[in-house]
Regions:
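Short helix-to-coil transition segments within interhelical loops
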Residues: 79, 154-158, 163-184
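Short hydrophobic, aromatic-rich alpha-helical segments embedded in or entering the lipid bilayer
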Residues: 211-225
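Surface loop/turn motifs at the tips and blade-to-blade linkers of beta-strand repeat domains
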Residues: 41-42
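Membrane-water interface segments at the C-terminal ends of transmembrane alpha-helices
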Residues: 2-36, 45-155, 183-199, 203, ...
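An amphipathic alpha-helix/helix-turn recognition signal
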Residues: 46, 159-160, 179, 215, ...
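A broad detector of short, well-ordered amphipathic alpha-helices
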Residues: 162-163, 218, 230, 234
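Ser/Thr-centric signal marking residues that sit
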Residues: 54, 130, 175, 180, ...
Length: 261
C-alpha cells in the first residue's frame, strides 16, 4: 500500500478542523434547548411574531431585488461598457460596508434634514422604527447576492439563441421572456434564496433603523442581554432551522444544475 504524502495529512487535518469549527457550535446550539423549551418558544407570540416579521421582510427584500435587480443583471451579462467594473464594484459595496454603517447611512437620507427624506415623509412613508425601514435595509444588504447569481445565469445562456429569436422577428422583451428567462431561472431562484437567507439573518443594520418592531435576530439579542444564554437559545434554534431549510433548497438547486451541465 502506497504511503500517504504528508501534504495529504495536512490538508485532511485542516479540513477536519474547519468542519468541526463550523459544526460543533451549531450542534451544541441545536441540541441545548429541551423540546418543552422549543415548544414554549413556538407558542410564544413574541417569538412567532418576530420570526414571521423576519420571513416577511426578507421575502419582500428578495422580491424587490428580483424586480429591480433582474434588468440590471441582464444588462451586465450582455454588455461591456466603460465603467462596467466600477458599477459592479458599487453593487458589491453592501457586502464590505459594516452593517451598522448601512443603517446609519440609510437613516441619513431618509431623515427630515435630507431632501429625499422630506419627499418620503410628505408621501406618508416612515422609515425609522417601521417595517418599511426594515425592508429597505434588508434589500440593501441582500441585493448584491441576487444580482451576482442572476448575472451568472444570464451569462450561461448563449447570446446566439437570442440572436436567432430576434432574427425571427421576436422583440427583445419577448426573447427575454421566452428564451433567456426559462434558461436562467434556476440561477435567479438561487439568487432569491441567497438574498432571503442573507436578509433574514441581518442584525446590525436593522437594530439601527428599527429596533421595534423586532425581527428574530433583534429578539434573540434582547433576550440574551436581558435573560441570558438559556432564554435566547430556543429562539436562535428556530431561526437556524429556517436558515438551514433555505440552505437545503439552495443545495438541491445547485446540485441539480451541476448535474444538468
Amino acid at each position: 500500500m502506497r504511503e500517504k504524502d504528508p501534504f495529504f495529512w495536512i490538508t485532511l487535518s485542516c479540513g477536519t478542523f474547519i468542519a468541526a469549527y463550523i459544526l460543533l457550535p451549531l450542534i451544541e446550539l441545536i441540541t441545548s434547548p429541551s423540546i418543552p423549551d422549543l415548544w414554549e418558544s413556538i407558542k410564544d407570540k413574541d417569538v412567532a411574531g418576530s420570526i414571521w416579521l423576519s420571513v416577511y421582510t426578507a421575502g419582500s427584500a428578495a422580491i424587490i431585488s428580483f424586480i429591480f435587480g433582474t434588468p440590471l443583471a441582464y444588462f451586465l451579462a450582455r454588455h461591456d461598457f466603460k465603467g462596467k467594473r466600477f458599477l459592479e464594484a458599487i453593487i458589491d459595496l453592501p457586502i464590505v460596508i459594516p452593517h451598522p454603517v448601512v443603517g446609519i447611512a440609510l437613516l441619513g437620507i431618509a431623515g427630515r434634514n435630507h431632501w429625499i427624506g422630506r419627499i418620503i415623509s410628505d408621501l406618508g412613508i416612515r422609515v425609522l422604527g417601521s417595517v418599511t425601514g426594515i425592508i429597505a435595509v434588508l434589500t440593501f444588504v441582500g441585493l448584491p447576492f441576487y444580482i451576482h447569481s442572476a448575472k451568472s445565469g444570464f451569462e450561461s445562456v448563449s447570446p446566439r439563441l437570442e440572436k436567432v429569436s430576434r432574427s425571427l422577428g421576436a422583440s427583445m422583451s419577448s426573447t427575454f421572456l421566452r428564451i433567456t428567462f426559462p434558461l436562467g431561472w434556476r440561477n435567479m431562484l438561487v439568487g432569491i434564496i441567497m438574498c432571503s437567507a442573507r436578509a433574514i439573518s441581518e442584525f446590525g443594520a436593522v437594530i439601527v433603523v428599527a429596533y421595534h418592531p423586532m425581527t428574530a435576530p433583534v429578539l434573540i439579542y434582547e433576550r440574551f442581554e436581558g435573560y441570558g444564554l438559556k432564554y435566547s437559545q430556543p429562539v436562535a434554534v428556530l431561526l437556524v432551522l429556517i436558515c438551514l431549510f433555505l440552505f437545503f433548497i439552495l443545495r438541491i438547486l445547485t446540485l441539480r444544475k451541476a448535474g444538468e451541465t
